[in-house]
């Protein structure tokens, strides 16, 4: 019962991931960070099968670091999403495909704009202004539809996230143990408290 949320603002992407690691009815870890920093301006949030998620996230991070070392070039969010999608597509054709759903948030430093990508385990990749993965999409997409606008400020995005958190607390029969929220902008990636 993992939840990932993200919304793109004027010059940032605000992300949130549920902080509990749950297996069945048992909470295994109350402070599980479901994100992986890929480089200074790319952040990947992931959910899915427990072993697959961590393994795939570390694999992508290591390969992006290797590319950066070899070519002395940081991948853009779009290039990172394309590479990640290719790896999911290749895995899908194997005997043991990764069962991982992803939100990829990044800031394109050359163009000075934020980008958000939604990827699923079937290697679908879509650029979106806001996104959800997991059961949260049943309740939060309508909130994003209602309140999203392209020129969101960070305060407005935080308010929308709070509305989503309140709706999930009200509707979901599970306690997510809070959310870990991060911002990706021109200054890089930082964690914030909401």
From Swiss-Prot:
Belongs to the peptidase T1B family. GO terms for biological process: proteasome-mediated ubiquitin-dependent protein catabolic process. It comes from the Eukaryota. Non-catalytic component of the proteasome, a multicatalytic proteinase complex which is characterized by its ability to cleave peptides with Arg, Phe, Tyr, Leu, and Glu adjacent to the leaving group at neutral or slightly basic pH. The proteasome has an ATP-dependent proteolytic activity. The 26S proteasome consists of a 20S proteasome core and two 19S regulatory subunits. The 20S proteasome core is composed of 28 subunits that are arranged in four stacked rings, resulting in a barrel-shaped structure. The two end rings are each formed by seven alpha subunits, and the two central rings are each formed by seven beta subunits. The catalytic chamber with the active sites is on the inside of the barrel. Keywords: Cytoplasm, Nucleus, Proteasome. SUPFAM superfamilies: N-terminal nucleophile aminohydrolases (Ntn hydrolases). It comes from Schizosaccharomyces pombe (strain 972 / ATCC 24843) (Fission yeast). This is Probable proteasome subunit beta type-4. Its main location: cytoplasm. Gene3D superfamilies: Glutamine Phosphoribosylpyrophosphate, subunit 1, domain 1. InterPro entries: Ntn_hydrolases_N, Proteasome_beta2, Proteasome_bsu_CS, Proteasome_sua/b, Proteasome_suB-type. One of its GO terms (cellular component) is proteasome core complex, beta-subunit complex. It is found in: Cytoplasm; Nucleus. Pfam families: Proteasome.
